[in-house]
UniProtKB/Swiss-Prot annotation:
GO terms for biological process: photosynthesis. NCBIfam families: PS_I_psaM. GO terms for cellular component: chloroplast thylakoid membrane; photosystem I. Keywords: Chloroplast, Membrane, Photosynthesis, Photosystem I, Plastid, Thylakoid, Transmembrane, Transmembrane helix. Belongs to the PsaM family. It holds the Pfam family PsaM. It is found in: Plastid, Chloroplast thylakoid membrane. This is Photosystem I reaction center subunit XII. It is a single-pass membrane protein.
Amino acid sequence: MTAISDSQVYVALVSALITSFLAVRLGLALYD
């Protein structure tokens, strides 16, 4: 079992936010 460091949690959170942001922009572009 590997311990998750704070930096890994931060990177995962940022990447998730970027992915959701791009998904929303893509959805709006397709909707428009």
